[in-house]
């Protein structure tokens, strides 16, 4: 009888405890939900944010001037084409004395990761130039024209081609192969990333962010804007601020503060981790290409 009484008493105590726990839960859960709701509604503390200051193209803190504005000391190019004029490195080509495609090379080293900025101006409708970087000083490649293309060429075109080949041999000492930040008077190609002297040719058009990998077609990662919209920021016949950033496999071209093209180059067959800096001149007719305020900033 005593055992039965204890059993009943235990059941009573257990039921009381269960009721107490259930009641506490009913009270606690809404309270916790109320606190969570208050926390969700409570505004987060405002994070301080300051707009980044625009970079001043003329701020040279941490940069090295690689053209003194007076002489071609440290630069190597044919005097037939290149000289200093009004504080600028100037390349000239005329109908009577064409330059062909040739370069003036900075002999101060082979930078790997860096920023390079220069002001450029092109004069003459046929003017075509660019900034070579991470480039190689190699003999010119023989130009091979398919027979069917050769058969379609006029005598004038054949003569120009023959003249170009002769000039390439004459100025072979300054032949360059590698990445080029392109610049032409008509701004058809200005801002694009062109690879001079290799089968790749144009790698990233103006307005494109492109990635290359071994054995795969080039991939368009993003568009930076339409080619025509970006072209509107380029000033024909005037000074333009051109900046090249080479950091690891990432290459960026900027003109007058606007990103023109980006390449992420991971193709080991073509990617160059360091090399020469040079300015190119080419084109037909009377033309002039000027470069001033040339500054280099090496990156880690």
List the predicted regions and their residue ranges.
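Short, hydrophobic alpha-helical membrane anchors of single-pass surface/secreted proteins
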Residues: 11-14
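Bacterial N-terminal signal peptides
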Residues: 16-28
